């Protein structure tokens, strides 16, 4: 991936996920924010992604995690700002994910850490003192979309990222890195996650378009049936409105080369 493509990915992600106030701040010269504020904001964005299942389950142990949110974020903030991984990012990452002080499972930790680095990857050049990390060492955030991609690639068959074990996670991590080594499109796992995320969005849209096309075909068949039975539908305002919308939708569908 060339530098222009990489920057486009970063800019699009910032545009989609950062609030208006922070998007404005990032364009300011001189900067009106401290590095710590921006890093804290990145972690605050990553946190909801990590605890989505925790909030849904709402068990007593998970409630403890929610109550310790600020302590957990501070723990990761301190590690990131100190570049605590040194020369061995994988070992540091494993130790962080294995931390049981706050009741966090390995799978939840990986999501929080990896999403935090995804945000930092996008804004590192906006910091006065950049985080000293080789982003090629970073891991892909495991979620429903990336696990589906890993399933399709034969890397793993697990379905729940929040319950991943350390051994399962390491197999996935290594499998993803092997895929990257054989892929000239991306340089690291974070770039791959951007593309997997986009591909999933495209697939969802195409699926909806396909369903829409099938539904329109069925609607046309039903209307033809009533007309064949002698019902006067042309003077029915509701039916006319539906037919007009069908014509518009057909134009959109015609643009799709995937159907």
PLM feature spans:
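Long amphipathic alpha-helices with heptad-repeat character
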Residues: 209-212, 216-219, 246-249
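Short, charge-rich amphipathic interface segments used for partner binding and complex assembly
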Residues: 232-259
């Amino acid at each position: 991936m060339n530098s222009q493509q990489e920057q486009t990915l970063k800019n699009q992600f910032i545009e989609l996920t950062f609030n208006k106030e922070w998007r404005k701040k990032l364009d300011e010269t001189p900067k009106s924010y401290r590095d710590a504020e921006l890093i804290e904001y990145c972690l605050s964005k990553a946190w909801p992604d990590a605890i989505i299942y925790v909030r849904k389950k709402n068990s007593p142990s998970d409630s403890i995690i929610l109550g310790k949110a600020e302590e957990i974020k501070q723990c990761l903030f301190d590690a990131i700002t100190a570049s605590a991984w040194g020369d061995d990012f994988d070992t540091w990452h494993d130790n962080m994910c294995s931390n049981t002080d706050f009741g966090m499972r390995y799978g939840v930790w990986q999501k929080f850490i990896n999403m935090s680095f995804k945000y930092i990857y996008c804004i590192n050049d906006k910091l006065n003192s950049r985080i000293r990390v080789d982003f090629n060492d970073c891991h892909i955030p495991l979620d429903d979309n990336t696990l589906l991609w890993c399933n399709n690639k034969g890397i793993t068959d697990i379905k729940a990222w929040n319950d991943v074990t350390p051994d399962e996670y390491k197999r996935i991590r290594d499998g993803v890195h092997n895929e990257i080594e054989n892929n000239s499109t991306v340089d690291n796992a974070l770039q791959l996650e951007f593309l997997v995320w986009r591909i999933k969005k495209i697939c969802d849209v195409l699926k909806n378009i396909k369903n829409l096309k099938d539904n329109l075909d069925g609607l046309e068949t039903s209307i033809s049936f009533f007309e064949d039975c002698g019902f006067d539908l042309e003077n029915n305002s509701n039916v006319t409105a539906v037919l007009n919308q069908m014509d518009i939708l057909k134009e959109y569908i015609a643009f799709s080369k995937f159907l």
